[in-house]
Each structure stands twice: as C-alpha cells, then as structure tokens.
C-alpha cells in the first residue's frame, strides 16, 4: 500500500504480483480514512507512507497545521488497525524511477513526469492515474519491489 498524504494525495493498494487492488483519491475525513484502511488485513498489509516531514514552502502556518493534522489522522488509523507502516522520504522512492531530481524541475513538470511513469507502469488504469493518485501508485510499487 502506498500513501501520498495530504488533501490532494491518494492511496494505492497493490497485491504481491503488482496488480492494482484499489486506487483512490485521499479520503476527506478521519472516519473515511479509517474505513478505507479497515478493508485490509493488518497481517498481510504493509503501508509505505510518504514522509514529507514539513509543510510545502510558501504555505501559511494554518495550511501547514492542516496538513500535519491530516497526516496524523492517517498515522493514527494505520496504528489503530495494526497495519505495519514504513515512512519513506520522497527522494528515496522517487530515485527508484530514474527520473532525475525533483529539484531540477518545475513542480508541475515534475508531477507530470511522475504521472507519465505511473501510466507506463499501470496502463490498465487509464484515467484513474491522475495527479492525485500517481504518487500513491509509485509509492505502492516501491513498497512492493523493496519488500517493505
């Protein structure tokens, strides 16, 4: 399972063979987050949660606090359900896709590159690969390939 936290993120679940079980935009409320994760067996699920570590540069303190609260809801739901969770910095999982460095691209160009890579890896999803779900899919594949 790969989780790109934040309101504009997503969650993707792959089986051990890499088939997509579920791919969706980030649930809106803490209860919806809990219900999403509740569908999965804690003994058979590993979640890689992107460790952003801080708010986005230029965001207000209230936006940063909102992001931190949302991230806390994700962590608490995973903890409450006993789902093994591994945090991973974006630079680490992004490196495995050989796209270069995010710092060398405009944010919109970098997101487009990530979306294209997810579309290449998961062509069967078609339009379900969006800017909201592409990172989650790539994080889930990173999780699967590194046997987290």
Name these PLM-found stretches.
Residues 1-148:
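Phosphate- and other anionic-substrate recognition elements at nucleic-acid/protein interfaces
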């Amino acid at each position: 399972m790969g989780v790109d936290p934040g309101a504009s993120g997503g969650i993707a679940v792959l089986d051990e063979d890499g088939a997509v079980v579920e791919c969706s935009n980030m649930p809106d409320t803490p209860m919806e987050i809990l219900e999403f994760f509740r569908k999965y067996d804690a003994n058979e699920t590993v979640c890689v949660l992107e460790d952003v570590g801080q708010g986005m540069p230029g965001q207000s303190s209230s936006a940063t606090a909102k992001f931190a609260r949302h991230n806390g809801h994700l962590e608490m739901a995973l903890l409450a359900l006993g789902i093994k969770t591994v945090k991973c910095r974006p630079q680490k999982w992004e490196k495995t896709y050989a796209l270069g460095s995010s710092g060398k691209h405009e944010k919109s160009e970098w997101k487009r590159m990530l979306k294209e890579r997810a579309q290449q890896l998961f062509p069967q999803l078609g339009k379900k690969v969006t800017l909201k779900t592409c990172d989650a899919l790539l994080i889930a594949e990173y999780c699967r390939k590194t046997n987290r």
